[in-house]
Regions:
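Alpha-helical interface subdomain recognition
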Residues: 1, 69-74, 85-90, 94-242
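Active-site beta-strand/loop segments that form the cofactor-binding cradle
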Residues: 2, 6-8, 12-15, 27, ...
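A short core secondary-structure module
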Residues: 4-52
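Solvent-exposed alpha-helices and their adjacent loops that cap or buttress functional pockets
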Residues: 12-17, 30-34, 59-64, 84, ...
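Short, solvent-exposed loop/turn segments at the edges of secondary structure
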Residues: 16-18, 35, 65-67, 208, ...
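Short, solvent-exposed coil/turn linker segments
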Residues: 32, 43, 77-78, 132, ...
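Flexible, small-/acidic-enriched active-site or ligand-binding loops
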Residues: 45-76
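Cytochrome P450 core scaffold surrounding the K-helix E-X-X-R motif
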Residues: 51, 81-86
Length: 242
């Protein structure tokens, strides 16, 4: 195989322990859409593979893990380096993305719980105008709504996991897409409330909240942006009435 092209945001390629890439390439542009791509193993470092630069995410390079911009210039690898066979790249990706998305959402629930904990501790420990912050400005509602929304999303994640176990990843895609939209957005909302409760401290390096927020905001793009998942959900719903 001879590989040419480039890609941005190749996560993990900056880590010195990264010695092999699973590279998604077009091997048959004339095939049906889901059979055009293949996955090929490319060692690192390797002739023709140029790591151009680390891509920044919200101003940080995320070293040493990194999200790299990489170019491939006539990269020649043995034909045996293909995974499963020609045209099966999309199939492989789809098999990974469902479990990957639900894993992201499970971790996001944990992030939301941590943010709510920090919010509550701050609300009880900080006073203003002779009262704790919890008693001011409708903050009871903020705390209550955060708990409600976290638990709603947790149940949605559990349902998606159940559907994956019972009907399979492909058939459960509506439920997977639903949590991929709902959970990061919910978590961002809880983190934002926690930041607001902390004031300037919330965006400083002295709490994890700023890093939590950037991670969850990035997750709305990783493994498919919200808009793509909403399209999946809507199309699956409409199928019931066509």
């Amino acid at each position: 195989w001879v590989i040419n092209g480039e890609k941005h945001y190749i996560s993990g390629a900056g880590d010195p322990r990264c010695k092999i890439m699973i590279t998604m390439v077009v091997t048959n542009p004339d095939a049906p859409k889901h059979l055009r791509q293949s996955q090929i193993l490319v060692p690192l470092p390797y002739p023709g593979v140029e790591v151009v630069r680390p891509m920044y995410v919200f101003g940080k390079d995320d070293a040493p893990h990194g999200h790299m911009h990489i170019k491939f210039d006539n990269v020649r690898v043995p034909k045996e380096n293909i995974i499963l066979g020609e045209g099966r790249g999309f199939e492989i990706s789809q098999g990974r993305l469902g479990p990957g998305r639900i894993h992201h959402c499970m971790r996001s629930i944990g992030v939301a719980e941590r943010a709510l904990e920090l919010l509550c501790r701050r609300a009880l420990s900080r006073t203003a105008f002779g009262k704790s912050l919890a008693e001011l400005g409708g903050n009871y509602d903020v705390i209550a709504n955060s708990r409600i929304e976290i638990d709603m999303c947790r149940l949605a994640v559990l349902k998606a996991a159940y559907m994956m176990d019972t009907i399979g990843n492909k058939e459960a895609r509506k439920y997977i897409s639903a949590i991929k939209v709902a959970v990061p957005n919910m978590t961002l909302k809880v983190i934002d409330s926690a930041i607001q409760m902390h004031g300037a401290l919330g965006v400083s390096q002295d709490t994890p909240l700023a890093a939590m927020w950037t991670g969850q905001r990035t997750l709305r793009l990783a493994d498919g942006p919200d808009e793509v998942h909403r399209r999946v959900i809507a199309r699956e719903e409409l199928k019931q009435y066509q």
